[in-house]
Amino acid sequence: MDAAATAATATAAAAMVWFRKGLRVHDNPALDAARRGGAAARLYPVFVLDPRYLRPDQAAPSPGSARAGVARVRFLLESLSDLDARLRRLGSRLLLLRARDDGDVAGTVCAALKDWNIGKLCFESDTEPYALARDKKVMDFAAASGIDVFSPVSHTLFDPAEIIEKNGGRPPMTYQSFVAIAGEPPEPIMEEYSELPPVGDTGEYELLPVPRVEELGYGDISQEDLSLFRGGETEALKRMRESLHDKEWVAKFEKPKGDPSAFLKPATTVLSPYLKFGCLSSRYFYHCIQDIYRSTKKHTNPPVSLTGQLLWRDFFYTVAFGTPNFDQMKGNKICKQIPWTENEELFPAWRDGRTGYPWIDAIMIQLRKWGWMHHLARHSVACFLTRGDLFIHWEKGRDVFERLLIDSDWAINNGNWMWLSCSSFFYQYHRIYSPTSFGKKYDPNGNYIRHFIPVLKDMPKEYIYEPWTAPLSIQKKANCIIGKDYPKPVVDHAIASKECKKMMGEAYASNRLDDDKPDKGKSSNSSRRKLSAGSQVTPNSSKTKQLKRSS
């Protein structure tokens, strides 16, 4: 081969691995494929930052951008820094690009594919609607440009499309049927790399350093008591190994159990944000748990076991992928149509932790500060917002969780909100979490409340969950006057919960009637269509009736 031909071959020999989720080196089929073959003489590991995800939003109710609270932004940036460090140890690096045209991630990737003469593009498959539309643009460009594309499924244990195909073209609608169809997941890639191909010439492209969250203009966040959970693959593997070190705990793990008030040492693994960003491979995690199960005489089983939680995750991914309009009530054939209310006073009180119910408010403050709370705490505040007390649309709560949770996941977040509002999957709407007695079962002294609501730190434990019942003399001694230093309850739980049950019963009856209509189940192509509030019924709002002790 002459020198010109050799140079031409070298110029064409380039592969790109496009990171989106899957921010890891271990068990990463896209990275593994990109480093192999003739096109891997040079490897371009790319992540594209969308400015809209980071840009400060002064109108947002808490620090961060319109799309993400400061805790999740920080977790992402830490994950990118860690990925870059791990790639550098292998002789590579992360190429961080800024999206062109204010959010055109696909256009930015396509431009790099052309300018860097990429012959093979590898990226992890993503089933979210936004990602499907984005990836189609890139794949169409690649096809037209003669670029090979490899997009493996590795964010979940199973391929949702394959599960749906095995189920006759429909997603399985119960966990049990999903598990029966799924079987055992593929084995993870266990190879550990000693090096990766070098990065090729990037020309005149501006390669960004990973910014620090303090540099993004979110204002003074020093007092925000930011999350204890550091992002990145290194922390994910460390946390997983620490969780699995206690084999007896792993074998006996049962999801319904656990203390939602435990915050300094949470009662769960807190691996969900690492799975969400792909810092931890779900298949590798599953494989490690199974190794422990094989070494123990007895262990719990799905749905309550640790592996059962990973299967729940895949279940929601599969149902979400196979259900049009999964992220809204209208046009969603699996979601009950309920006349939820709109209330411009009650919703901000819930969102900002100002309901006057310390258990609810402490949870929402933990969410804002840490971006995480125990699953039973999530159940409490979701029930309170929707079918328990305020009867406000689950989509409103979903949006708050979507912005603030560091483990916010499109399929799981929407699925859980439909579940907890009794809109789908779970229908025992009469079972309501008490905003006063539920937390007390786990934390009678109210330590969780005292931590996140310091104004209540000196309230006697007899009144910590219902401070409005404390005599004025006790309130003065605790330096917390209800209605002045801490709000009065926005609703009377005893009254509001009865009204909610009544409205849920009426809505269920209406849905049964609608089942007989011939046009039942038609889909809407609109995205997150908002409900009209004109004919909706509002439970007791800020004009609260005289309060009784809640059950």
Curated annotation (Swiss-Prot):
Pfam families: DNA_photolyase, FAD_binding_7. InterPro entries: Crypto/Photolyase_FAD-like_sf, Crypto/Photolyase_N_sf, Cryptochr/Photolyase_FAD-bd, Cryptochrome/DNA_photolyase_1, DNA_photolyase_N, Rossmann-like_a/b/a_fold. Residues 533-544 have a biased composition (Polar residues). Residues 374-379 are annotated as: Interaction with DNA. One of its GO terms (biological process) is response to UV. Residues 13-157 form the Photolyase/cryptochrome alpha/beta domain. The record marks W340, W394, W417 as: Electron transfer via tryptophanyl radical. Binds 1 FAD per subunit. It comes from the Eukaryota. FAD binds at residues 255, 268-272, 309-313, 372-375, 378, 407-409, 413. One of its GO terms (cellular component) is nucleus. It catalyses: (6-4) photoproduct (in DNA) = 2 pyrimidine residues (in DNA). Keywords: DNA damage, DNA repair, DNA-binding, FAD, Flavoprotein, Lyase, Nucleotide-binding. Belongs to the DNA photolyase class-1 family. This is (6-4)DNA photolyase. It comes from Oryza sativa subsp. japonica (Rice). The gene is UVR3.
